UniProtKB/Swiss-Prot annotation:
Top-level EC class: hydrolase
CDD domains documented for this protein: S14_ClpP_2
Role this protein plays: Cleaves peptides in various proteins in a process that requires ATP hydrolysis. Has a chymotrypsin-like activity. Plays a major role in the degradation of misfolded proteins.
Location within or outside the cell: Cytoplasm
Oligomeric and partner information: Fourteen ClpP subunits assemble into 2 heptameric rings which stack back to back to give a disk-like structure with a central cavity, resembling the structure of eukaryotic proteasomes.
Family: Belongs to the peptidase S14 family.
Protein name: ATP-dependent Clp protease proteolytic subunit 2
The gene coding this protein: clpP2
GO biological process: protein quality control for misfolded or incompletely synthesized proteins
Active site, UniProt feature: 100, 125
Protein's UniProt keywords contain NAD: no
Organism, as annotated: Myxococcus xanthus
Length: 206
């Protein structure tokens, strides 16, 4: 993956100019950005940001923007569990795509506060995995993948209200949805256009 420099923004304060990297500046406004594939390093950063924002104000919403193709199930579940653990309501907003584990995090937002932009793409499916080694090791890993599959399906059922039968059928292969379909499915609550939640400005659009 090519290196992408992190932009900086400069603000005027009563003490003069102050520069922030864009991630830190967004964090000041309780915005967390998940914009990559999910692995342990990414999950640790997201978890740390959620815990920090809870310590800052346990009653104020956190806004998690998601543009992710998915990734590690265990890393994603670390983020999921932290979202459920913190006292702050976590609003989720899909920009671009929320696929695989990214879709699970999208639907795990606070009820009534799960959003997608109009051109977003959402995809759910069963976990992927490749195994090599002795037959016993392969059997162990296969059982674990099936356990993860059942776990993720349970979470989708819990947060969407769909039946387990439908979720098992839909996740058997890649199941793509646009924003309207994701709303009908129960993955999101609202399609955002124009923006009327969260932002850096002093006033929000109505």
């Amino acid at each position: 993956m090519p290196f992408m420099p992190v932009p900086y923004v400069i603000e005027q304060t009563h003490r003069g100019e102050r520069s922030y990297d864009i991630i830190s500046r967004l964090l000041k406004d309780r915005i967390v950005m998940l914009g990559t594939e999910i692995d342990d390093d990414v999950a640790n950063v997201i978890v740390a940001q959620l815990l920090f924002l809870e310590s800052e104000d346990p009653d104020k919403d956190i806004n998690l923007y998601i543009n992710s193709p998915g990734g590690s199930v265990t890393a994603g579940l670390a983020i999921y569990d932290t979202m459920q653990y913190v006292k702050c309501p976590v609003s989720t907003i899909c920009v671009g795509q929320a696929a695989s584990m990214g879709a699970v995090l999208l639907l795990a937002g606070a009820k009534g506060k799960r959003y997608a932009l109009p051109s977003s793409r959402i995809m759910i499916h069963q976990p992927l995995g490749g195994v090599r080694g002795q037959a016993t090791d392969i059997e162990i890993q296969a059982k674990e993948i099936l356990r993860m599959k059942a776990k993720l399906n349970e979470l989708i059922v819990k947060h969407t209200g769909q039946s387990i039968e439908r979720v098992e059928k839909d996740t058997d292969r890649d199941y793509f949805m646009g924003a309207s379909e994701a709303k009908a499915y129960g993955i999101i609550d609202e399609i955002q256009n124009p923006r009327k939640v969260v932002g850096l400005g002093k006033e929000e659009k109505k």
